[in-house]
Amino acid sequence: MHKNSLLGQIIYTSIMSAVLLMACLEWFLWLAAFLYCLVKVFQKSEHWSINVLCIIVGTAFVLLRVIFLPIMVVTLPLPDAIAKLWPEEMVSFLQWFAFWAFAILLTVPWLFCIYQVVTNQLGRTKRMKQVLDDVTAPKVVIVMPCYREEPEVLIKAINSVVDCDYPPSCIHVFLSFDGEEEDNLYLNTISQLGVLLKTESHPRSIDVKYRSARVTISRFPHGGKRHCQKVTFKLIDRVYEEYLKRNDNLFILFIDSDCILDKVCLQNFVYDMELSPGNTGEMLAMTGVITSTTKKHSIITLLQDMEYIHGQLFERTVESGCGSVTCLPGALTMLRFSAFRRMAKYYFVDKAEQCEDLFDFAKCHLGEDRWLTHLFMIGAKKRHQIQMCTSAFCKTEAVQSTRSLVKQRRRWFLGFITNEVCMLTDWRLWKRYPILILVRFMQNTIRTTALLFFVMVLAIMTTVKKVDDLPVGFIAISLGLNWMLMLYFGAKLRRFKIWLYPLMFILNPFYNWYYMVYGIFTAGQRTWGGPRADAAAADSHTTAREAAEQAEKQGDELNVVPETFKAAHEARRAASNRESTTTSELGRTKSVIRPPGKIDGKFSARQKTASGMYAHPDEMDISANDVEKGRRGTRGFFADRDSLDSISSAQNIDLGVSTPRRMKLLMNEEDLRKYQLGQQIQNRNSGIDDAEGIYRQPIRTPSAFPHAHSASANDIPLHDLGANDTAAQGSRSEDIQRFSEGRGIGTRADNGRSRNVGNSSFASRMAKRTPKTSR
């Protein structure tokens, strides 16, 4: 027995020594990295309040970290020979302090999460009691940038969108290819979507109807994901410009091309943002729940699955309860279009070109989603306008290899810590979201303490310590509270593998330790050692984005020279415009640490004016002449939501995008018959009946359509079909009058603003009322 006990102590001491060294290194590196970011923010600050907060936050952070260091030592189950060296009074006080400090820091967020789970429905269940149709459902445009995606993955993503339990006529997918080449991916995709054109080259933008939903397929010059989203937004803005003047029920959803939407994802998003009882229409942005899926299961994919669920349903739900989420991921984010439109020029600016060093590169490029969320948080006028929708789900493919996972998590870590410090030093966030920022700060102080729990488990396994000798309450709070939530989440979502949360509780600290140490050392090597000889740099011929892409292709996204980005950008702008070599944006010698003050409160929804138009408060001075001019230049209040309403007013505006060509205009009669036959087959396969009579309309050859004015020889807009049909206008008026008198979905009792008026498809209304009369 004595030999076994001695052997257990030897094994325990040897393992514990290594783990303790790891914990100390992690403790020091996190402190050093946080202070380094504070110093960089202090050096780059554009306002004195940033410097003051740097000092206050830095001092408080160091003090709390220093206090937790002796707590870590006395809490560890050290051998008795060592534990006897500590004064009993000091040990008792520190353990008492540790218990209550961690209890508060863990229990308070847990209670916020419980409150959010109770007050908001969790799960993939339909929340709408009424059936949405093309009148009551708000319009949703989905932006899906695509670059070198697997064809079957892309088609699966598109199908998940158009097959959502949402009126197809209210779905408009913008599938944007990041590149103008007509490669196999593009040709295969348009073929799958029913494009039967056999030409040497296709229009840069094509409109098709796929499973009763509208899909706009576009090819843009290669510029990266954010640039692709930018030019797509310009196209959307051009399409719906006039529609937005008379409606504020247009929403834009950003998703990745490998994301699979849940069946009720769109409906639940819209319910929370617009249609829930008592909704005032002030919700501006929401993110959903992104879960991982995989074809090949492993311990890595299992940990990712549990981490995704815990990180979103716990951490983001807590943030949502405190006032706002701090990260709107580009993989699943819905925004109110009229509000986002005011932020677009700040949202889509090329942040990489403003980088001066690796700190800026990590903040604006690696942590782009967090930086942009910071932008929205300042732009919002009040709390709880940027939230988490716990009933909108989508799936994305989990990372399969350890190498790819480490690179991904290094990117996340560097983007997180740089943006976290920027948020903690922005007094506007402390003023608007005090509880949120305080919770974020306190959680940062207790990071990197998870390895201690492994030591406690090891002590029990090696019988060096008894359970009575360990801080059981300490373990019960940290593990027990989280495990209870994961048990509930697993049962609610029927995702029972997340019940293995204790496995993640033990293993994840080691993975997180490696992610952080690897990220800090590689970033530090780049910062103090200088760039490698093959590092990508920007110059007069290479943009910052191209340099970043070159580094990613080489397998190391940190192998760049961000010090060259801003200088190269200024040189190119000076060469392109000799008369104005500087701007207000470039006149500053230091990079921007926080969003500019002029966006404060700018992220807001439009309000209805006396003239029936929608405008922001600072746009309310529209004169009667302007309103009348707008009426004469558009199709009127009852605009057909399926048309490109803004084309007539935007023909002479060069936005650098191509107006979509309606595919029917490019077909001969035989191809058109094949296309409509394919549409009927798609319709049957997707389970959608032809109640609206869409396919019973007579076939119209290209010659049957009137000639359309186009911005260029290659760009033909969709036509204003039926715009002069007075009978249709009368039918629309009857629809709106009847629907507005009832207080159902689509009306708002507080200000009398009716939603979605006249939004039903013109073709569907004509088919219902005069089935024998063609459009």
UniProtKB/Swiss-Prot annotation:
Residues 542-556, 732-741 have a biased composition (Basic and acidic residues). Residues 766-775 have a biased composition (Basic residues). Induction: Exhibits higher expression levels in hyphae than in germinating conidia. Expression is increased in the absence of chitin synthase CHS2. Gene3D superfamilies: Spore Coat Polysaccharide Biosynthesis Protein SpsA, Chain A (3.90.550.10). It is found in: Cell membrane. One of its GO terms (cellular component) is plasma membrane. It is a multi-pass membrane protein. Residues 532-541, 702-713 have a biased composition (Low complexity). It catalyses: [(1->4)-N-acetyl-beta-D-glucosaminyl](n) + UDP-N-acetyl-alpha-D-glucosamine = [(1->4)-N-acetyl-beta-D-glucosaminyl](n+1) + UDP + H(+). One of its GO terms (molecular function) is chitin synthase activity. Disruption phenotype: Does not affect mycelial growth nor sensitivity to various stresses. Glycans are attached at residues 724, 759. Signal peptide: none annotated. It comes from the Eukaryota. Keywords: Cell membrane, Glycoprotein, Glycosyltransferase, Membrane, Transferase, Transmembrane, Transmembrane helix, Virulence. Residues 532-603, 702-775 are annotated as: Disordered. The chain crosses the membrane at residues 19-39, 54-74, 94-114, 441-461, 470-490, 498-518. Residues 577-586, 754-763 have a biased composition (Polar residues). One of its GO terms (biological process) is chitin biosynthetic process. It is an enzyme of class 2 (transferase). Belongs to the chitin synthase family. Class VII subfamily. Polymerizes chitin, a structural polymer of the cell wall and septum, by transferring the sugar moiety of UDP-GlcNAc to the non-reducing end of the growing chitin polymer. Shows additive effects in septum formation with CHS1, CHS2, CHS3A, CHS4, CHS5 and CHS7. Involved in virulence and mediates mycotoxin deoxinivalenol (DON) biosynthesis via the regulation of the expression of TRI4, TRI5 and TRI6. This is Chitin synthase 6. It comes from Gibberella zeae (strain ATCC MYA-4620 / CBS 123657 / FGSC 9075 / NRRL 31084 / PH-1).
